[in-house]
Every structure is written in structure tokens, then in C-alpha cells.
């Protein structure tokens, strides 16, 4: 389609959240147009770093809603999603004090042994088996971008950093680094960890919400051939998740390490304490000398105190601005649910602005 500088909705941020939101908007309202503005290549921000395990784990009622909506979205598009999302059996290591069934959406099977031969569970945990999927985030972003452009009402513009946003009675206007402007009836900011410090107004707004950035660590793991299997393990009590990469050729280990207030554009180095924790877990699970670190992924995401995503108007920037952020390292697996909720919020605002009840 020809360049549209005046769409109904502008989405700033071409990661999986922004692209999924654009696709949801176009699907929900066949009369709307949407333009996605991405400062780099699509999917090259925080979306490219996660290990990308799609597990049905939730902490709160909103979190559960987003998990269930996301899984339903994928199941409704099973033929398309098979290209970038594949199933992996998940064994949960459950400590005595954790009521896992209250935090996992689909049914679980107690007593069934899920870990492969040669793998070992930590002492004192129960093993519970469930479903999970691994995702190729880059392939998914490409598929979402194609869905947006194929609609005939959407476009994706790369290498277009947005540096300012203003609003008047007619709508919102964003200014790009190259001087171009785009205007729309509504703007969605899907900036991931770049939102809190995007400008002074978002900085104050984020501080009021308790929205902060935190470093997130992941390791690429090579495993001895005799121990390789299409299997994943999750240990909520230790906040560790181990699973094969979507394309094969290795495994991914994600683990928590609290380092707050991090600039997403600063150099990110692996922390020794993270390697030590990973070693303790993998030596137990696989055995010493049976695995090695083949690479690492260090990135940044935004978090709230409640570990709940924020999908809300940002009146610090204007009445026509909605923010989708605070994904606490789970943006890949929650993206469809976040997109659906964001799309409903945006379309409701547009209808209200046009005087529709």
C-alpha cells in the first residue's frame, strides 16, 4: 500500500507486542488502518533475546486472562503458528510450599515422569507434567508483519525512530528522527524497556506506577548428544526454565537475577553469579561435564511491583495514547493476550472520541 502518514492508529514499536497489537486492531475492525513505526528492524529490540518458552504459568487473575487468551489465539491459528511455535513436553519441579495447579492454566498430570532418561530432578520436589511450546520470535515477528501488510490497511515502517509525541483536538502526531511526522486518531506505545525513559513525561508516569527496568539473563546451552531430548523443565521455586531452542541445535536456560534501573541501550555483560546459579542447576539436572555454555543473551525488560503488564491510557502524554508495557520478561508468551486487550482499549477510545456509545 502507499505510505499512509494519517492512519487511524499508530503503533510505535515493531516488536512482537506492537505487531500483534496492529494485527489485532486490523482484525477487530475492518474499517481501520494501522501504521507500525519501528526504530530498527522489526523484532530486533527486546523481542529477539528471550529463550521464548510459551508456558501457561500465571501469577494473578489478569495474568491468567492473558495466558488463556494467548493460547487460544495460537490454537485458532494452528496451521500458521506451526512455522514458529512447536510443542515441547514440560516437567514442572514443584516445591512443597507451592500450589502449582493454582498457577497453571491447562490441566497437569501428577505422578507421570516427564524428564528424559539421564536427567535428574532436585531432591524434595514433585514432578508434574504439562504442555509448553517453544517459539522463534524473529519468525513470528515476520509473520505478524506480513499479516499487517496483507490486510491492505496496514503498513510497517522500519528504521524510523519516534522522538516526540503531541496531541490536539484532532488527534495525535508523532515526530520521527528524520523529521517526518505521522498523525492518527490514537497512538499505541509498545516500546518495551525503552518506555520509562522515553521522555520526561513517561519517566514521571512510570515512576508513579512503579514501572522499572530490570536486566534479564539467558544462557545458550550445549548438551551431550546422549542427553538431548525434546523436553523442557520449569522450576518456579528457583525461577529457572530450561528448554530446547525452537530450531534445534541447543537449549536455552532462563533465570532471574535482580539488577534494576538498567538502560536498555547500555552494554550488557553476563554476571558471574548467574553462571554460578546455572552451573548448580545444570550439574544437578544433567551431570557435571555433560553440558557447556555456548552463548548468552542479556537483555532488559520493564516490570511492575505486581509483575502484571500495564495496558492503559497514558494521560501524561495525552488522551489519545495507550501504553502496553511491563511484560516482565514474558512478552513473547503473553503477546496475543496483551494485543487483544490493547486493541479493545484503543477501539473503545476511538469510538468515544467519535461520539459512539
Mark where each language-model region is.
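Beta1/beta-strand and adjacent pyrophosphate-binding region of the FAD-binding site
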Residues: 3-17, 35
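Helix-loop-beta segment of a Rossmann-like dinucleotide-binding subdomain
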Residues: 82-92, 109-148, 256-262, 322-327
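Glycine-rich FAD pyrophosphate-binding loop
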Residues: 26-47
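Active-site substrate-recognition segment that forms the wall
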Residues: 23-24, 52-54, 83-87, 191-319
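C-terminal catalytic lobe of FAD-dependent flavoproteins
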Residues: 287-357
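Short hydrophobic core segments
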Residues: 10-12, 182-195, 339
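Dinucleotide-binding Rossmann-like beta1-alpha1 core, especially the glycine-rich loop
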Residues: 51-125, 239-241
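A conserved short coil-to-beta-strand element within the FAD-binding core of flavoproteins
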Residues: 155-172
Amino acid at each position: 500500500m502507499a505510505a499512509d502518514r494519517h492512519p487511524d492508529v499508530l503503533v510505535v514499536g515493531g516488536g512482537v507486542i506492537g505487531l500483534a497489537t496492529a494485527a489485532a486492531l486490523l482484525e477487530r475492525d475492518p474499517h481501520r488502518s494501522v501504521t507500525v513505526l519501528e526504530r530498527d528492524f522489526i523484532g530486533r529490540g527486546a523481542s529477539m533475546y528471550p529463550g521464548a518458552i510459551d508456558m501457561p504459568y500465571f501469577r494473578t487473575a489478569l495474568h491468567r486472562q492473558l495466558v488463556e487468551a494467548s493460547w487460544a489465539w495460537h490454537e485458532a491459528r494452528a496451521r500458521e503458528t506451526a512455522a514458529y511455535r512447536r510443542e515441547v513436553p514440560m516437567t514442572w519441579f514443584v516445591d512443597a510450599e507451592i500450589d502449582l495447579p493454582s498457577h497453571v492454566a491447562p490441566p497437569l498430570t501428577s505422578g507421570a515422569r516427564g524428564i528424559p532418561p539421564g536427567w535428574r530432578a532436585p531432591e524434595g520436589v514433585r514432578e508434574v507434567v504439562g504442555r509448553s511450546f517453544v517459539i522463534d520470535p524473529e519468525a513470528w515477528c515476520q509473520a505478524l508483519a506480513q499479516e499487517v501488510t496483507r490486510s491492505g490497511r496496514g503498513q510497517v515502517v522500519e528504521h524510523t525512530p519516534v522522538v516526540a509525541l503531541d496531541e490536539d483536538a484532532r488527534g495525535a502526531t508523532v515526530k520521527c528522527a528524520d523529521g517526518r511526522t505521522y498523525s492518527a486518531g490514537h497512538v499505541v506505545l509498545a516500546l518495551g524497556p525503552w518506555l520509562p525513559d522515553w521522555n520526561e513525561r513517561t519517566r514521571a508516569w512510570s515512576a508513579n506506577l512503579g514501572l522499572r527496568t530490570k536486566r534479564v539473563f539467558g544462557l545458550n546451552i550445549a548438551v551431550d548428544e546422549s542427553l538431548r531430548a525434546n523436553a523442557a523443565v520449569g522450576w518456579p521455586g528457583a525461577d529457572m526454565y530450561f528448554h530446547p531452542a525452537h530450531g534445534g541445535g541447543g537449549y536455552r536456560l532462563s533465570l532471574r537475577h535482580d539488577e534494576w534501573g538498567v538502560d536498555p541501550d547500555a552494554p550488557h555483560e553476563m554476571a558471574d553469579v548467574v553462571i554460578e546459579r546455572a552451573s548448580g542447576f545444570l550439574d544437578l539436572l544433567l551431570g557435571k561435564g555433560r553440558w557447556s555454555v555456548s552463548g548468552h543473551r542479556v537483555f532488559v525488560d520493564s516490570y511492575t511491583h505486581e509483575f502484571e503488564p500495564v495496558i492503559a491510557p497514558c494521560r501524561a502524554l495525552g488522551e489519545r495514547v495507550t501504553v502496553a508495557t511491563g511484560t516482565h520478561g514474558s512478552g513473547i508468551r503473553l503477546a496475543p493476550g496483551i494485543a487483544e486487550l490493547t486493541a479493545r482499549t484503543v477501539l473503545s477510545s476511538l469510538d468515544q472520541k467519535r461520539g459512539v456509545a
